[in-house]
Structures are given as structure tokens and as C-alpha cells.
């Protein structure tokens, strides 16, 4: 079984990345960095969690 991970950049919202053994840290265990802004990439399942914690819910009223 092959597991495919989808990464997203939290800064520029890009999805292109490179991996390097030199970039492996506790917060970035796979060593993935954005090729555009060099930020640490996050997995797509963490993007939804970050959006929920960073933004207040929007209430639409008429």
C-alpha cells in the first residue's frame, strides 16, 4: 500500500515542494519545504485544522 501525502504551504498556499535530509526537524519530520518561499510545508489534513484555529467562524445574517 502506497501512502500519498498532499502538502500545502501555509504562507503562499503553494503545493510544490522539495524534501531534504538537512531540513528534517521535530516539527518537519519529512523535511518538506516550499520551492517558492522556502517555508516548511504542512500536510493537507493539518491545513483544515489550521484554518479552523486561525479564522473566526463567519456568521451570515440577512
Swiss-Prot record:
InterPro entries in the record: YmcF-like
Secretion signal, residue range per the UniProt entry: none
Induction, per UniProt: By cold shock, 10 degrees Celsius (at protein level).
Pfam families: YmcF-like (PF23641)
Origin: domain of life: Bacteria
Family: Belongs to the YmcF/YnqF peptide family.
Note: Uses the non-canonical initiation codon AUU, which may limit its expression.
Protein name listed in UniProt: Protein YmcF
Amino acid at each position: 500500500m502506497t501512502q500519498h501525502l498532499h502538502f500545502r504551504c501555509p504562507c503562499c498556499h503553494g503545493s510544490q515542494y522539495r524534501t531534504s535530509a538537512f531540513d528534517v526537524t521535530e516539527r518537519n519530520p519529512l523535511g518538506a519545504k516550499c520551492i517558492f518561499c522556502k517555508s516548511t510545508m504542512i500536510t493537507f489534513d493539518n491545513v483544515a485544522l489550521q484554518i479552523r484555529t486561525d479564522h473566526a467562524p463567519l456568521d451570515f445574517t440577512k
